């Protein structure tokens, strides 16, 4: 990612120049080229001969990762459900989110915890825990507000910070979200995934759970931009929540009937035999509404096309080649 690294140096350098600030000959903007999801490692010798400047960068960033204390972490980390950042160091940090109240989540597919934005939240939390004080402010995917897979993450954040503000900007076209008044709800970015602003504050390391606040913003993109330009913590109508076991939700939810719901039979107690069924990984390619649709693919062997109960009351055709699905 050399291009954004160079552009960041250029823009910050120009902005500082506009203010009258001048760098000394041995000074630089403290922007570093590194993967924050990896620990400090000594690659300087690898680059010293071929790319001396990069070797110096490695030495500088290793010093930052090892010695520096951070009290403010801000950003818009990437959202990548199929994360390629699977190093041992970050995986060990994320493992804390796989437990709630000392017990494993027990989720069949907790893959959402491997999303890159979750890892960046975990890193920020780790940095501020080391500092003992600080502020975290990210704009990220908003899925962790109520999804059961993230309940360990929500509880863990509540244990680290004194205040947690969750500002849901919605705009999730995957869920076909609409505004409360029925009008169209738009994303502030050109993406399908809904987003939210997370703001947390930490004044000391404490054993008490944090106060959690929630606010929401619906409407068109222009309306959201207009509101965000003038909004502050005190003007955004945050509601104080009381997240409780077992889900620790970051949304305002009516829990009047929860105890009755929790005491009812679970679905796996009613239906004792179950399975995930067929998972193709690419239904658009391997599942069709009829045999003819799949037979049009010249790469498919017609003898492997089968009828399938795709969904309840939804019978379709599937190319059932075990080597591919």
Regions found by a protein language model. Name each.
Residues 1-167, 171, 175-176:
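SAM-dependent methyltransferase catalytic region
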Residues 84-89, 107, 126-325:
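Sequence-level detector for compositionally biased, low-complexity segments
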